[in-house]
């Protein structure tokens, strides 16, 4: 039903109401709530408002508004004499929360969306990280022990070989020293022998000179 048709029906229904106070309320006052809010203290006014609701066939004006539209047509409520604010009108026109139907696309997307879990809550990651962080397996321990034993044997063999090489080098040096000493002693012996031979030759030369002089004196006589 259009807003102008509702306003005309309200104006026609207001003629059936008796005169109250200084004057009868207009149709816009009834729609905007001035008549209901200004005279709610009187019991007679309450009964008259119930008669008006019976004539209209609806307890509130909000039932005449089509909520299927994107925006409700509230042009017929525009009255300069109204005292209700836009917030109150929105409260009168807005549908109840129970009537709001969630969109199937949004709910389906929210249900189908997987819930993200933190890395700490994932059992797969924790189980995958646990072997590397935990103790090593017996096979790896045996291999590590075997590698350690091989390294130890290699170092011991290398040290033994170095000791033997150092011993051979020291022995060779000692042999060379002994050989040099023997050669030195031999040279010393030969030197002494040569010196003795030279001394003998000098002695013989002196004897030969003396004999030659003796022969010369005899020949001169």
Swiss-Prot record:
UniProt KW DNA damage keyword: no
Annotated SUPFAM superfamilies: Leucine zipper domain (SSF57959)
Keywords: DNA-binding, Nucleus, Transcription, Transcription regulation
Comp. bias regions, Polar residues: 127-139
Region span, Leucine-zipper: 198-212
Domain bZIP positions: 152-215
Tree of life domain: Eukaryota
PROSITE patterns, per the entry: BZIP, BZIP_BASIC
Matching Gene3D superfamilies: 1.20.5.170
Induction and repression of expression: Expression is induced by sucrose, glucose and arabinose which repress the gal4 transcription factor, a negative regulator of the ochratoxin gene cluster.
GO molecular function: DNA-binding transcription factor activity, RNA polymerase II-specific; RNA polymerase II cis-regulatory region sequence-specific DNA binding
Record GO biological process: ochratoxin A biosynthetic process; regulation of DNA-templated transcription
A cellular component term, taken from the record's GO annotations: nucleus
Region named Disordered: 109-146
Loss of function: phenotype: Leads to the loss of ochratoxin A (OTA) production and the down-regulation of the OTA biosynthetic genes. Produces greater lesions on grape berries and is more tolerant to oxidative stress.
Cell compartment(s), UniProt: Nucleus
Chain intervals for the UniProt region annotation (Basic motif): 152-192
Family annotation (PANTHER family): ACTIVATING TRANSCRIPTION FACTOR 3-RELATED (PTHR23351:SF24), FOS TRANSCRIPTION FACTOR-RELATED (PTHR23351)
Function: Transcription factor; part of the gene cluster that mediates the biosynthesis of ochratoxin A (OTA), a mycotoxin demonstrated to have nephrotoxic, immunotoxic, genotoxic, neurotoxic, and teratogenic properties. Positively regulates the expression of the OTA biosynthetic genes and subsequent production of OTA. Probably binds to conserved 5'-ACGT-3' bZIP binding motifs found in multiple copies (3 to 4) in the promoters of the OTA biosynthetic genes.
UniProt name for this protein: Transcription factor otaR1
Protein source organism: Aspergillus niger (strain ATCC MYA-4892 / CBS 513.88 / FGSC A1513)
Lineage of the organism: Eukaryota, Fungi, Dikarya, Ascomycota, Pezizomycotina
